A protein has these predicted regions:
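Surface-exposed helix-capping loop/turn segments at secondary-structure junctions
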Residues: 72-88, 153-158
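ATP/Mg2+ or Mg2+-diphosphate-binding catalytic cores
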Residues: 90-176
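Sparse recognition of residues in long alpha-helices and their boundaries
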Residues: 43-46, 86, 132-133
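Active-site acidic catalytic loop and adjacent metal/ATP-binding pocket
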Residues: 1-25
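Active-site activation/catalytic loop segments of kinase-like enzymes and analogous catalytic loops
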Residues: 24-81, 108-126
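A general structural-boundary detector
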Residues: 14-17, 57, 103
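Glycine- and acidic
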Residues: 12-16, 45-53, 98
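Short amphipathic alpha-helical segments and their helix-coil junctions
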Residues: 8-15, 85-100
Length: 176
């Protein structure tokens, strides 16, 4: 890392993580982790069914909060710090936010697909001892990932993503 300081300012640059990529990447990666935890929670052991429901609700609320907070914070930073040449561009901010809503579920899906095919560790599912339950959690994850990957172009808010997750879980449970 590099630290640059003057009398009134300090900047820290970590060159290892200096990356300019899609705005929705980090958010998508984190949401993907929460989705995998949600799928695991559907099938791993809990002290009670009430505990399972509470944890699943917590995960969905966390996804909602993350997305909404990201969008609000991005908008506030844009309004406060955007360069002058972008300030007057009608619809640019909305276009960027919509792009995040399209990209983020795609990245969430990709991280879980890689985990499902054992390209990277899947600790959320590794704690599920029952092989059938573990398989069901993996299949549910793949179904949700598929659903959000191909449904993402219609998402306008976190609610749309969460509706997809809940809807796919409900349909999957009917097949068990």
């Amino acid at each position: 890392s590099n630290i640059m300081a003057s009398r009134d300012k300090m900047k820290v640059i970590d060159m290892e993580f200096a990356f300019m990529g899609p705005f929705g990447y980090d958010l998508g990666y984190l949401v993907g982790n929460l989705i995998s935890q949600y799928c695991a929670a559907c099938f791993k052991r809990f002290p009670s069914e009430q505990n399972r429901k509470q944890f699943k609700a917590y995960l969905l609320a966390t996804i909602q909060s993350l997305i909404e907070t990201y969008m609000k914070t991005f908008t506030l930073c844009w309004e406060r710090s955007v360069k002058e040449r972008y300030r007057g561009q009608q619809g640019l901010l909305q276009s960027i936010l919509q792009e995040v809503m399209v990209d983020m579920p795609g990245y969430a899906s990709m991280v879980n697909w890689f985990r499902s095919v054992s390209e990277i560790p899947y600790p959320d599912f590794d704690v599920i001892e029952n092989k059938d339950a573990k398989r069901n959690a993996t299949v549910l994850s793949l179904m949700i990932d598929w659903g959000i990957m191909f449904g993402r172009y219609k998402y306008q808010s976190a609610d749309d993503l969460i509706e997809t997750i809940i809807g796919i879980e409900e349909e999957f449970r009917k097949s068990l």
